[in-house]
């Protein structure tokens, strides 16, 4: 791994933190939940990774995207004399950049493209998912037949619910027949039965 990419890794970590906070906040905004009050910092940090691992096709897509960008970089550096490549890398006629400097420039540009695609994906996922879920709750069109679960509480009470989400501290769910989200601490739940 080049020194340039190693220097960018701390920014990647900071990027992941900010991306997690923004994505979670945007997802829960239409549901009138300030998720930062109900989450630990670890929940926020791992939320982008948790979303990716929830849908294996997304992992494959981002791995594929990484390979595409890698081979695109190889193509750029191999065809450095082409007008389109020079324009993409912002190389002027009197530019005296070395091959290493051009490699570094290509790395930076392609990493920024990858980060921009991640932002677009997670913002779209947060906005679309949050508003769609809020609409389904409001209209009573949640698919309880397919996704319902039974929560058994420590008190002996049981509820048929659709779990919206959970983190290390709380469960967020909609009880069958209701149109509001309930938030329950994990410690008060004895078991969760999936149907």
Q: Where do the model's predicted regions map?
A:
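Cytosolic juxtamembrane regulatory segments of multi-pass membrane proteins
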Residues: 48-50, 89-113, 148-160
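Residue-identity detector for glycine
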Residues: 12, 20, 66, 124-130, ...
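N-terminal first transmembrane alpha-helix
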Residues: 1-103
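Terminal membrane-proximal soluble interaction domains of membrane-associated proteins
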Residues: 135-195
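Phenylalanine-focused residue identity feature
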Residues: 27, 61-67, 71-72, 88, ...
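Internal/C-terminal transmembrane anchor helices
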Residues: 98-134
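Juxtamembrane/interface segments at transmembrane-helix termini
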Residues: 75-79, 129-136
């Amino acid at each position: 791994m080049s020194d340039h990419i190693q220097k960018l890794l701390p920014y990647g970590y900071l990027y992941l933190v900010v991306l997690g906070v923004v994505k979670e906040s945007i997802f829960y905004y239409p549901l009138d939940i300030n998720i930062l009050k109900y989450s630990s910092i670890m929940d926020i940090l791992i939320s982008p990774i948790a979303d990716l691992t929830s849908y294996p096709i997304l992992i494959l897509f981002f791995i594929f995207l990484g390979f595409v960008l890698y081979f695109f970089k190889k193509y750029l550096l191999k065809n450095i004399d082409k007008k389109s490549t020079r324009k993409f890398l912002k190389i002027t006629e009197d530019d005296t950049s070395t091959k290493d400097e051009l490699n570094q420039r290509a790395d930076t540009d392609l990493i920024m493209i990858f980060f921009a695609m991640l932002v677009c994906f997670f913002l779209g996922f947060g906005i679309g998912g949050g508003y769609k879920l809020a609409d389904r709750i409001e209209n009573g069109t949640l698919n309880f037949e397919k996704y319902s679960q039974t929560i058994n509480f420590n008190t002996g009470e049981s509820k048929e619910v659709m779990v919206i989400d959970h983190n290390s501290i709380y469960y967020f769910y909609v009880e069958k027949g209701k149109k509001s989200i309930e938030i329950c601490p994990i410690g008060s739940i004895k078991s969760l039965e999936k149907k």
